[in-house]
Amino acid sequence: MVKVIDIGRVVVKVLGREAGRKAVVVDIVDENYVVITGPKQLTGVRRRRVNINHIEPTDKKIDIKRGASDEEVLKAVEAAGLVEYMREKVKPKFFGITSAEVK
């Protein structure tokens, strides 16, 4: 499967303190990094640069422009009817092992 990471794509963070939370890609820095935002008041993910290996794209996409502000992203999420979807947390899996199995 080809990873499709483009502006407006909803992604799930799979590593780090925000693992399992959803965010939206707002800018592509280079072939390894993108800028994402939750926005923070919606999902708890603040705007930051992340490695593409630390996120997993979903099939959802919203219509935003490159570098959109958190307010613009929030309005686009509301317009697409994805507010509850964005608030849901996903149990992160890394290499097929859940954190409960690591003990």
Curated annotation (Swiss-Prot):
Record InterPro entries: Rib_uL2_dom2, Ribosomal_eL14, Ribosomal_eL14_arc, Ribosomal_eL14_KOW, Translation_prot_SH3-like_sf
Ribonucleoprotein found in the keyword field: yes
Gene: rpl14e
GO biological process, one term: translation
Descriptive protein name: Large ribosomal subunit protein eL14
Cross-referenced Gene3D superfamilies: 2.30.30.30
Domain of life: Archaea
Gene Ontology MF terms: RNA binding; structural constituent of ribosome
Similarity remark: Belongs to the eukaryotic ribosomal protein eL14 family.
GO cellular component, one term: cytosolic large ribosomal subunit
This protein's UniProt keywords: Ribonucleoprotein, Ribosomal protein
Disulfide bridge positions per record: none
